[in-house]
A protein has these predicted regions:
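RNA-binding basic/glycine-rich loop and surface signature characteristic of RAMP-family CRISPR effectors
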Residues: 1-232
Length: 232
């Protein structure tokens, strides 16, 4: 199962943002077959737990069905892990909407990126009869000269009797760096949800005017993406 041969990034945002591979079957003309590929322009890291797994289990059975037919229920168990997770999203704005001889206009490129950012802001998933909220509680990043996951592996969690805090040191070290002679701190913003982490004031002092709410953080990214593509 794969994308149709006649479908391109022009029709498919999924192909544009997350790449594709189309394989060709061997035939009399093409003895070797082959594949047509495009790398993802939006890269997502694995979601990594910030807390250890403590062997929590959820025990299930089909008692409702079994009772209806007078049988004994079947038992099952599922590993459960309630934790904070961290993941990194990297978007190469220069490659959005480009594939071979196809290039979309800047307005369409911008629309696709903006919609993706809006989705991340309210991300959730449906699984096993429940809906889980995956929207971010803490975000850090910006629009840079290079599509690089600067903060991958830098988000660490500390916990004590007062609550949880985000480790500031690793993030501070990143923003103190430079790229092409420009300070990363100048282009970096942070967003936090109130009442979740107890060291909000530390980040407010570190980022000053670039300390925002999560909603305003994404609003700032949308603004800079529009500026990049020259779209109002």
């Amino acid at each position: 199962i794969q994308f149709k041969d006649n479908i391109s990034i022009r029709e498919s945002e999924e192909m544009d943002l997350f790449g594709y591979m189309k394989t060709n079957k061997k035939d009399e003309k093409d003895k070797k077959g082959g594949s047509l590929t495009r790398e993802a322009t939006v890269r997502l890291s694995n979601a990594i737990s910030l807390e250890p797994y403590r062997s929590d289990m959820d025990f299930l059975n089909n008692k409702g069905f079994a009772d209806r037919i007078g049988e004994h229920p079947n038992l099952a168990n599922i590993e459960q892990h309630l934790s904070y997770y961290t993941y990194t999203v990297t978007i190469d704005l220069s490659k959005i909407g480009k594939d071979g001889d196809i290039e979309l206009d800047n307005k369409e490129k911008c629309r696709r990126v903006v919609e993706f950012l809006e989705i991340i802001k309210v991300l959730n998933r449906n699984i096993r009869g429940r809906q889980e909220n995956l929207s971010p509680l803490f975000v850090v990043g910006g629009v840079y000269e290079i599509a690089n996951p600067f903060f991958l592996g830098r988000i660490k969690l500390k916990g004590d009797k007062n609550g949880f805090k985000i480790n500031k040191q690793a993030i501070e070290e990143v923003i103190q760096g430079t790229f092409l002679g420009k300070d990363l701190k100048e282009f970096t913003y942070v967003g936090m949800v109130d009442g979740v982490f107890i060291n909000k004031e530390e980040f407010k002092g570190l980022f000053e005017d670039n300390f925002l709410s999560v909603d305003k953080f994404f609003g700032q990214l949308v603004k800079e993406v529009k500026e990049y593509y020259g779209v109002n």
